[in-house]
């Protein structure tokens, strides 16, 4: 895997009236699944978003069929807000996504990631 990305994570900040809100997105190569990497990264970036960027809301929209991604969000305190029916197309197939979010009022800081 030398020289290749193993995953990615980021926040896309909203603009104008949504400037204190951000969308969280992430991916991890299959060889690294099941090691807690994504959960640790989501916790760390969520903390950074609320504490350093002064966000009031962070949301994510994983595929409804992605139980592992949904579990990561739930372990990090995100709450399911709704189903986005037929909202994405992956490999030519129209699929549903789910909306998960966490607000600054519900955020519970955790210990720094070692």
Language-model region placement:
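Acyl-donor (CoA/ACP) binding surface of acyl/acetyltransferases
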Residues: 1-114
